[in-house]
């Protein structure tokens, strides 16, 4: 079968032929329809320091997808041939304390699809049936293919009660924009998103944020005054991993504010911890999606009218995958979809 693989320890992704993966007793065989390119895939393409430490070569990459069930392991129940599915890209052990306690997303033995085991940038994918999620008929293939990153946004945004709150989102990448859209959809008062990339800030405006602020040109305190905010933000969603953005967030949070952090800052990032302490801030780290509550909320948010369509900006055939990666690497894109049909 055709697959996009990391074949060499250098920049790039290559189209290759690999065997169709073997179906285990508890697995589903999925024929891939559409995949989306993640920032993680771009890191792997660029062969940065993280990738060099993490990715075995060769490796079929990719973990954002939608497809059709074409094979079912003999122990599997609840699925049938033809079911349209996406799936959780974190394969968990099932036997650690967190897994057994119902906190599966905190499994210490997590294996990543397209990172530690073969991924979805291929004609077929095998995953445990436990990880598959049936897609409702009224959700399109395009939207289903981005459920993985949408789940990061939903998990981050819904970490705290947002109704009537003022929310600051730092980082207008696709996940940050989707998190801002979720916050607005569920009843936040003001949702302000910050970045320095004007293309992505314009995408955020299309998604209905209260204000999209280019912090290279505008002062955030002036924006807060314009919105009538006198006490700071109630909730912060840190999606950028940029130290200056996080420091600004700490400066502008209200006392007792709550911060969810998905962005990964450099290990040597320094902050003024007195602001965390004396403001009584609560900071929560976010990794992946809650299994599977986040997935049900994703489907329900779309079914209740949340429109994510503006975030998908580019669509290519899999044979034009290089154009897709070029678009993602340019920084002038939202989500990029690759069609395998």
From Swiss-Prot:
Chief subcellular location: cytoplasm
Enzyme Commission number(s):
1.1.1.103
* Top EC class for this record: oxidoreductase
Its BP terms in the Gene Ontology are:
L-threonine catabolic process to glycine
Positions with a binding annotation for NAD(+): 175, 195, 200, 262-264, 286-287
Name a single GO cellular component.
Answer: cytoplasm
Where it sits in the cell: the answer is: Cytoplasm
Residues of the signal peptide: none
Locate the residues binding Zn(2+) 2: 93, 96, 99, 107
* Catalytic residue list: 40 (charge relay system), 43 (charge relay system)
What does the UniProt cofactor note say? Binds 2 Zn(2+) ions per subunit.
Query: Does the entry feature the keyword Ribonucleoprotein, yes or no?
Result: no
The protein's annotated catalytic reaction(s) are: L-threonine + NAD(+) = (2S)-2-amino-3-oxobutanoate + NADH + H(+)
Q: Where is this site: Important for catalytic activity for the proton relay mechanism but does not participate directly in the coordination of zinc atom?
A: 148
Output one GO MF annotation. zinc ion binding
Q: Which residues bind Zn(2+) 1?
A: 38, 63-64
Necessary cofactors:
Zn(2+)
Pathway, per record: Amino-acid degradation; L-threonine degradation via oxydo-reductase pathway; glycine from L-threonine: step 1/2
- Keywords associated with the record: Cytoplasm, Metal-binding, NAD, Oxidoreductase, Zinc
Q: Which superkingdom heads the taxonomic lineage of this protein's source? A: Bacteria
Q: How does it assemble?
A: Homotetramer.
Assigned protein family: Belongs to the zinc-containing alcohol dehydrogenase family.
Q: Which HAMAP family match?
A: Thr_dehydrog
Q: What does this protein do?
A: Catalyzes the NAD(+)-dependent oxidation of L-threonine to 2-amino-3-ketobutyrate.
Q: What is this protein called?
A: L-threonine 3-dehydrogenase
Say which species the protein is native to.
Escherichia coli O17:K52:H18 (strain UMN026 / ExPEC)
């Amino acid at each position: 079968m055709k697959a996009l693989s990391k074949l060499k320890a250098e920049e790039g992704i290559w189209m290759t032929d690999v065997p169709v993966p073997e179906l285990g007793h508890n697995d589903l065989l999925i024929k891939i329809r559409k995949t989306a390119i993640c920032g993680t895939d771009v890191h792997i393409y660029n062969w940065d320091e993280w990738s060099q430490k993490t990715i075995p070569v060769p490796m079929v990459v990719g973990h954002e997808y939608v497809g059709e069930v074409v094979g079912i392991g003999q122990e599997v129940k609840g699925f049938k041939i033809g079911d349209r599915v996406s799936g959780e890209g974190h394969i968990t052990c099932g036997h650690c304390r967190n897994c057994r306690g119902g906190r599966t997303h905190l499994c210490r033995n997590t294996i990543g699809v397209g990172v530690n085991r073969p991924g979805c940038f291929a004609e077929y994918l095998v995953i445990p049936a436990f990880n598959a999620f049936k897609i409702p008929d009224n959700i399109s293939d395009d939207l289903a293919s981005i459920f993985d990153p949408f789940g990061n946004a939903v998990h981050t945004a819904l970490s705290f009660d947002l109704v009537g709150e003022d929310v600051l989102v730092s980082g207008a990448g696709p996940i940050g924009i989707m998190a801002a859209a979720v916050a607005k959809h569920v009843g936040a008062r003001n949702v302000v998103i910050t970045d320095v990339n004007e293309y992505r800030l314009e995408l955020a405006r299309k998604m209905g944020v209260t204000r999209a602020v280019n912090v290279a040109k505008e002062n955030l305190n002036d924006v807060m005054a314009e919105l009538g905010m006198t006490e700071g933000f109630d909730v912060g969603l840190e999606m950028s991993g940029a130290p200056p953005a996080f420091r600004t967030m700490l400066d502008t949070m209200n006392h007792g504010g709550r911060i969810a952090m998905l962005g990964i800052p450099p290990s040597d990032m320094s902050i003024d911890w007195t602001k965390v302490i004396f403001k009584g801030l609560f900071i929560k780290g976010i990794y992946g999606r809650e299994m599977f509550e986040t997935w049900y909320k994703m489907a329900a948010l779309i079914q209740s009218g949340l429109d994510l369509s503006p975030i998908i900006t580019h669509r290519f055939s899999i044979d034009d995958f290089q154009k897709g990666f070029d678009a993602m690497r340019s920084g002038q894109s939202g989500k990029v979809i690759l069609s395998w049909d």
